[in-house]
Amino acid sequence: MLWSSVAHAQRIDTEHLFGFMIGTDVGEPGDKEIEGETVARWGKRPGSYFAAAPAFEAEFVPIENLRASATLSAAYHDISRIAGLEDRRQGAFDSLSFDLRYRLIERQQAGFGLAIDAEPHWGRVDPTSGEPVDRYGADLSLLLDKELVPDRVLAAFNLVYQPEATHSHLTGAWSREATFGPAAGLMVQIEPGILIGAEARYLRAYQGFALEKFAGQALFFGPTLYARLSKRLWVIAAWSPQIAGRAANFSGSLDLTNFERHQAKVQFGLEF
């Protein structure tokens, strides 16, 4: 049952609303929040593949229109009989990241919201293979959202660029890769504090920061649920299967070289 004080809340807040996308809301100056999440990825050929990344985030809004946060994350891999990957079952501390989101246009005033987001990170585990590495990268996003029906239906669009350089501890080699693509989502408030919807992401993987060599592409589409459980506590659950894709130099209707068959996320937040 939802907290009774939420029953009259109608305004849609997009700061935490989607599973794999980002909204343009950033909170109010002085807001503090802690968040926990786990992203799971599974499904590669021909054997068994599962990876999970539990994370803990602390967030603060220092000034109007600016949201800042820091995140610690771990990595777990269970890999067996996957072409090109060593069998392993391991868990380890993985990465540290810092996120800055700045809102350029406020949705309630202009009719649409516009923001930019940058999250540089350092990691010590390869997210696909679980191999020990040093990796340096960033998630850079352009964010747009608009209420199609006030306090009822909201649409969002993201454009994402994710460059990353990786240094292998095993071979000493450096690699430079990037992922680029758009994402779109729609959420409907069916009850005060409860929204359901869907997200679609079209991602292209490249070798090189300047998108020099195409490596593969994937289209993900799946449902998202947001629920405010109390005045201060919320939860998000999303599942995003790959419905189409292709890896470079490989036949088939999916890209299971650069991406997974399924991605899922569960996230909760506690506001102060």
Model-derived features: positions:
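Hydrophobic alpha-helical targeting segments used for export or membrane insertion
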Residues: 1-2, 272
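Transmembrane beta-barrel domains of Gram-negative outer membranes and organellar outer membranes
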Residues: 9-272
